[in-house]
Each structure stands twice: as C-alpha cells, then as structure tokens.
C-alpha cells in the first residue's frame, strides 16, 4: 500500500485589488508581512505612492529635455528605479504587465502591430501626398545611423522608460484607485503631457508640421504642442488597450517601437525618394 504524499500548506492572501497571492514557502513570510502592512496603511498611503510616481516622471522629463541628461543611461536607470519602487509598494509582476505567463501572448500582439504599422508606413512613403510627413530632419540619416537609432537608441533611450513608466508602473498604481477604462485614459493623458517639452522643437524639425502651422504666427508652437499632446494621448489609449487585452507590456512595447523606430527607417526611404 502506498503512503499518501504530504504537501506543505499553501497560504493565500487577497488584496483589495482582487489579486490573490500564494505563499508556499516560509521564505515568503517577509514579503507577505510587507504586503499586508501596505494594505493596512489604506488608501491615503497608496495615493501618496501614486503621486510620488507622477512627480518622479516630471523630474525625469525635466532631466531629459531641460537639463539634457543622456537618455541612454537615464532611461534604464529610471525604469529600474520605478520597477523597484513598485515592487517595494507591493505591486505584483502581473499588475505590472510582466508576468511570465503573459510574455508569449504579448509578443504575438506586438509583432502583429509591427506588421500593420509597417504596411501603413510603406503606403505613406509611396504616396507623394503623404511622403512629406516622413521628412523629419532629425532622421535624415545614413543607413547605419538609422539602424543604430531604430534598434538601440530608441528602444533603450525612449521606449524602455516610457513603457515601464506609463503602461507598467503608473498603470499598476492607478489600478488601485480606478476602474480599468479610467486607468487607460488617465495613463494616456499623462503620456500625452509627457510630450509637451519635446513637442516644442517639432515645428522646426519636421517639414510637414512646419508647413502646416506656418500661417499661425505666434500661435504655431501652441498648435504644435497641443496637437502633439492630443496625438500621443490617443496613441497612449491604443497602446493601453493592447496592454489591457494582452495582459502584457510587450504588446504596447511592440506598438511603441513600430511607430517610432519604423518611422526612422521609413523616413530614410522617404528622403531617398524625395531626392
């Protein structure tokens, strides 16, 4: 007669956010006590943590666009610091969109979006009426420079920080206070406002934007900034919906890389066609 296999009891806790956490090993006791302590602090403490994240993002934005700090180190350091703070505040990898079981689904969504954006951009540069939208002097680059920008500088210096900040950490904190549609809208509005400072240089850097607002005189910069905030906020809503549907940060990362990095690569082609 075989003896029954005895298994250790598994402790389970449930937070106000509806997340159930299993703690099968004694080594998790410290984590469990910390999370319970955070829950016991209540709504004011969670709200203060959310405000701290927003203020940190303001500081990172100023460091980048006013102080001129190098985003190739600012992006990774900022992303790691935000993730560490989120974990310390009790957010799980699932709440942050980084749970292992969601990776494959998120990557599939991301690759699908990349294919769609590539097709749209290809049509855009082939049509003379829309080709000027790709003629950005910042990306009038040789092929090697364009590849470096698309596959290294944009992912490390831009996408890493922005995705971790808005669709991972801020998303997780907002989900403690609001319904999902409010999380999507709130994070997207803040994502739009994040682009105020870089938008101030867009009127002189992009041929299509510059010609579109040339007749507005002193209001040209206001129009560019307002349009950029609106456009990026709408893009944030789309990226947020991808994040919500897939449950993974990788889906919105795919969209972000496609719109930015493919814009650089197709911009190189557009300049060659224009020549």
Each model region followed by its residue ranges:
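Alpha-helical transmembrane segments in multi-pass membrane proteins
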Residues: 41-89, 105, 109, 139-149
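Structural signal for membrane-spanning alpha-helices in multi-pass inner-membrane proteins
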Residues: 60-64, 82-90, 121-125, 195, ...
């Amino acid at each position: 007669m075989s003896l029954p296999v005895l298994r250790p009891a598994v402790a389970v806790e449930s937070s106000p956010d509806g997340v159930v956490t299993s703690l099968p090993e004694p080594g998790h006791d410290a984590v469990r006590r910390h999370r319970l302590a955070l829950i016991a602090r209540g709504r004011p403490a969670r709200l203060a943590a959310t405000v701290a994240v927003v203020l940190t993002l303001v500081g990172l934005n100023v460091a980048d666009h006013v102080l001129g700090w190098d985003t190739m180190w600012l992006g990774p350091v900022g992303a790691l610091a935000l993730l560490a703070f989120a974990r310390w505040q009790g957010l799980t990898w699932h709440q942050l969109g980084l749970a292992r079981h969601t990776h494959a689904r998120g990557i599939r969504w991301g690759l699908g979006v990349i294919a769609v954006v590539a097709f749209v951009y290809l049509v855009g540069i082939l049509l003379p009426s829309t080709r000027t939208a790709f003629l950005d002097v910042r990306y009038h680059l040789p092929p090697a420079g364009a590849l470096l920008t698309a596959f290294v500088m944009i992912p490390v210096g831009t996408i890493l920080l922005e995705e971790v900040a808005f669709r991972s950490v801020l998303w997780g904190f907002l989900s403690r206070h609001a319904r999902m549609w409010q999380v999507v809208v709130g994070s997207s509005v803040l994502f739009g406002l994040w682009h105020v400072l870089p938008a101030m240089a867009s009127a002189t850097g992009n041929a299509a934007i510059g010609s579109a607002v040339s007749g507005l005189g002193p209001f040209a910069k206001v129009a560019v900034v307002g349009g950029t905030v609106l456009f990026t906020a709408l893009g944030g809503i789309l990226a947020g919906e991808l994040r919500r549907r897939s449950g993974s940060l990788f889906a919105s990362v795919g969209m972000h890389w496609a719109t930015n990095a493919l814009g650089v690569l197709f911009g190189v082609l557009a300049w060659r066609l224009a020549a």
